[in-house]
């Protein structure tokens, strides 16, 4: 988004994808469509935040899978996957407040606390995982950080936008691996 480009915190403000964001969404869709080659079905539904920057990415993914001969997957909007509300910090530069918000319990005025975000995010994912099948989640950066906290992984890790990741439980915890598409 233009706010990403300017280093501004977006939170719940529904900033549309700019041309870079749309290209990233299209690329993510193409990467995911490759997973459905040879009749494979690595996930059976797409669960997305209602905020347009995530929803448009989810729509590009669904459409790319269908266009490449894959299934027409259901796209489910889950309001619990919305990005955190940053309160008075929305639209402001990412600054010295962000790390204390994650690590020290500081909450900007009018914002959702990191602990509340974590409870909401973990609850939403766990509710979805009670259903049969394998979902693909399309959401937001701070929400993903809160999931990392819930999985006992390092939290304040910045990843590129629209990058596909595998999250896998194991006997010793969780692993997160980027999906690296094979070159064609």
Regions found by a protein language model. Name each.
Residues 1-69, 100:
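Active-site-proximal alpha-helix that buttresses catalytic centers in soluble enzyme cores
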Residues 53-55, 84, 143-145:
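Short, active-site-adjacent cap segments at secondary-structure transitions
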Residues 180-184:
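Acidic, His/Gly-rich catalytic cores of divalent-metal-dependent hydrolytic chemistry
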Residues 4, 10, 15-16, 61-123, ...:
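Phosphate-handling substructures
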Residues 153-179:
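Domain-level recognition of soluble alpha/beta enzyme cores
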Residues 60, 146, 150:
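Active-site signature of alpha/beta-hydrolase-fold catalytic machinery across serine-
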Residues 44, 131-142:
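Generic beta-sheet signal
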Residues 48-49, 119, 138-139:
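Short beta-strand scaffold positions
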């Amino acid at each position: 988004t233009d706010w990403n480009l300017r280093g501004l915190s977006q939170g719940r403000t529904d900033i549309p994808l700019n041309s870079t964001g749309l290209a990233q969404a299209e690329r993510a869709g193409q990467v995911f469509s490759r997973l459905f080659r040879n009749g494979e079905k690595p996930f059976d539904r797409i669960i997305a935040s209602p905020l347009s920057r995530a929803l448009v990415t989810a729509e590009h993914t669904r459409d790319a899978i269908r266009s490449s001969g894959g299934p027409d997957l259901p796209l489910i909007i889950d309001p619990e996957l919305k990005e955190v509300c940053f309160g008075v910090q929305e639209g402001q530069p990412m600054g010295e407040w962000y790390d204390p918000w994650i690590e020290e319990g500081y909450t900007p005025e009018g914002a959702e606390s990191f602990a509340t975000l974590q409870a909401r995010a973990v609850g939403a994912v766990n509710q979805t995982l009670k259903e049969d099948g394998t979902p693909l989640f399309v959401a937001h950066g701070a929400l993903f950080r809160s999931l990392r906290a819930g999985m006992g992984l390092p939290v304040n890790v910045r990843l590129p936008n629209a990058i596909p990741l595998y999250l896998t439980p194991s006997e010793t915890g969780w692993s997160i691996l980027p999906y690296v598409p094979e070159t064609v």
